């Protein structure tokens, strides 16, 4: 019991008690490229500490893989250039990618191994026609029970739930009462709570909300978040990529403890048009994806036509 209590205290004070150092020159871009390429996606980390970042355009579009030092390793086979949101999950002890296909004419979801093997594909036609026929799917993740959740964040704001076999189960949430979602951009399963919840980035409303696993509205977790795009967890902490600049780190109660890379120039955030010559070290433009690594370091990928990654290491 004492060990559990001590761990809880350490995690709860982690961000408040430590500072973060911006890592200049991280990562090293693929050979021959000055930037990673047009980015409007996500970043996540595998169990070996390698980073996976989705890139929508350029010579190395798809998913680029970097080691912890920032060295480019390779691109992931069969990863498409429309993986707007994806999550690295563990299945039977193996790392697996769950990806939503934004703007695809036939595919809603792909499940890939980290070798690039296609393990499951869910077609758009799996969603019943009475629910809709035009979608803009922005993120996917695996529920604690193995179900697949995909969110329609650039269209209806509805959350689509499929079984592990890819068969459609139901749709939930949306723009109506009580959710009132407006650009439900991405989400994550919040296992800090029992039972687990869904933490949704309600981007246009500048807030994070909690749903139960059925999609029922529970509560507003945090407000005043500047266009939240994605969330990731490290112990009791959650980091939030904010399209209107900066990475916020919140505690379990939804209180902002730290803000990294804040930009005070409105012309340089909430846009993908800030060219490399205008980038400032340690200052974000439009963070779109973010992840913690196992040590609590923070990496973000921006919405940027040239493509940009930034990293902060926690000072212990």
PLM regions: where:
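Conserved beta-propeller blade signature
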Residues: 50-53, 96-99, 147-150, 197-200, ...
């Amino acid at each position: 019991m004492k060990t559990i209590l001590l761990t809880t205290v350490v995690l709860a004070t982690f961000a408040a008690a430590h500072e973060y150092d911006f890592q200049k020159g991280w990562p090293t871009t693929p050979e021959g490229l000055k930037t990673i390429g047009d980015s409007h996606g996500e970043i996540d980390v595998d169990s070996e500490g390698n980073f996976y970042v989705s890139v929508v355009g350029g010579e190395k579009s798809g998913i680029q893989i970097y080691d912890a030092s920032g060295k480019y390793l390779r691109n992931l086979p069969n990863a498409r250039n429309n993986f707007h949101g994806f999550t690295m999950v563990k299945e039977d002890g193996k790392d697996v990618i769950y990806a939503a296909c934004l703007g695809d004419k036939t595919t809603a979801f792909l499940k890939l191994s980290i070798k690039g093997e296609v393990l499951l594909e869910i077609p758009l036609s799996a969603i019943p026609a009475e629910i809709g026929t035009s979608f803009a799917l922005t993120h996917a993740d695996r529920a604690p029970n193995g179900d697949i959740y995909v969110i329609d964040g650039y269209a209806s704001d509805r959350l689509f739930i499929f079984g592990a076999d890819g068969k459609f189960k139901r749709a939930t949430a949306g723009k109506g009462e009580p959710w009132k979602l407006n650009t439900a951009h991405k989400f994550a399963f919040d296992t800090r709570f029992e039972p687990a919840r869904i933490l949704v980035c309600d981007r246009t409303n500048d807030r994070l909300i909690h749903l139960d696993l059925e999609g029922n509205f529970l509560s507003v977790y945090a407000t005043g978040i500047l266009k939240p795009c994605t969330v990731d967890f490290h112990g009791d902490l959650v980091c939030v990529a904010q399209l209107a600049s900066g990475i916020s780190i919140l505690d379990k109660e939804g209180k902002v403890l730290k803000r990294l890379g804040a930009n005070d120039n409105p012309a340089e955030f909430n846009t993908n048009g800030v060219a490399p010559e205008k980038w400032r070290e340690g200052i974000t433009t439009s963070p779109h994806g973010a992840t913690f690594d196992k040590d609590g370091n923070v990496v973000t990928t921006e919405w940027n036509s040239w493509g940009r990654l930034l990293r902060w290491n926690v000072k212990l």
